[in-house]
């Protein structure tokens, strides 16, 4: 069994980075959330929707961009838009045109003539243009080169609305670092850490030092010194969350929700 006793909730309007090693269950979790797989026990809800019911009102308000998308190869991008756009009441054709242009793609090209990365750009452009309330992206930067990843970050940041909830699963932490406002790290069938980045920045300090700090919660060699995480005192300036370092700390059992936030509760008491 991949997940047992899994409990997870996402605040509405969040952009969540779902992180985990390959095989940790990120894709399976997204399939469960989208209603393409069914839990053997327990319940899943997205807003008022139960994904397992696959009702039309739910299907037109969610878009799941899988890592490997099945596509009608003989269709051009424009034909794909006309056929698939009809299923999504919020689809915006002008928005689709603009995002395609940002990626340097033309509608007349057939999907089968595109590379993996180019097809990924088409489906990502379409997903954002549906304006669905729930967007689930599974490894969306797979197949993208470095310049395309930069465009990916810009188009996602520029096309997400406050009321949308977005979950981006990836093992490439740097690709989503500037996009997300919340992080969930799964390992061993459980969500080991689930937190708002502002909360983490308030609780933890991320820094480097030539020597290994005695009070570090997690540290790694970095050049000739160390990069580390330690508890932050209220008088210290906040630092940006180093997602890669945080990810490694959680997988190494150096940090968890309990170790971060129970400490906070005890300090308040």
Which residues make up each language-model segment?
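The feature captures the beta-strand-to-loop junction immediately N-terminal to the Walker
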Residues: 19-21
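ABC transporter nucleotide-binding domain
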Residues: 151-230
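Conserved ABC transporter NBD signature motif
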Residues: 42-53, 57-58
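Helix-to-loop junction immediately C-terminal to a conserved catalytic motif
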Residues: 34
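Conserved structural motif at the start of ABC-family nucleotide-binding domains
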Residues: 3-5, 59
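Catalytic Walker B motif of ABC-type/P-loop ATPase nucleotide-binding domains
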Residues: 135-139, 144
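ABC-family P-loop ATPase nucleotide-binding domains
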Residues: 60, 64-122
């Amino acid at each position: 069994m991949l997940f047992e006793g899994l409990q997870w909730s996402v605040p509405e309007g969040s952009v969540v980075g779902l992180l985990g090693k390959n095989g940790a269950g990120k894709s399976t979790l997204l399939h469960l959330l989208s209603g393409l797989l069914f839990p053997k026990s327990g319940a899943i809800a997205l807003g008022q929707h139960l994904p397992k019911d696959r009702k039309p009102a739910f299907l037109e308000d969610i878009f799941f961009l899988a890592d490997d998308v099945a596509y009608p190869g003989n269709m051009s991008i424009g034909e794909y838009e006309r056929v698939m756009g009809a299923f999504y009441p919020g689809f915006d054709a002008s928005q689709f045109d603009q995002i395609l242009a940002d990626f340097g793609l033309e509608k007349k090209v057939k999907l089968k003539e595109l590379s993996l990365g180019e097809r990924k750009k088409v489906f990502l452009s379409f997903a954002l243009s549906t304006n669905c309330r729930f967007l689930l992206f599974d490894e969306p930067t797979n197949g993208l080169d470095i310049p395309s990843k930069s465009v990916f970050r810009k188009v996602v940041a520029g096309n997400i609305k406050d009321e949308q909830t977005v979950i981006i699963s990836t093992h490439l932490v740097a690709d989503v670092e500037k996009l997300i406002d919340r992080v969930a790290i799964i390992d061993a069938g459980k969500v080991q850490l689930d937190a708002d980045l502002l909360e983490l920045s308030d609780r933890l300090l991320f820094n480097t030092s030539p020597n290994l700090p005695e009070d570090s919660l997690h540290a790694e060699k970095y050049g000739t010194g160390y990069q580390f995480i330690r508890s932050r005192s209220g008088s210290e300036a906040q630092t940006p969350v180093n997602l890669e370092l945080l990810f490694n700390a959680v997988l190494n059992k150096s940090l968890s929700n309990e170790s971060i936030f129970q400490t906070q509760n005890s300090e308040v008491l």
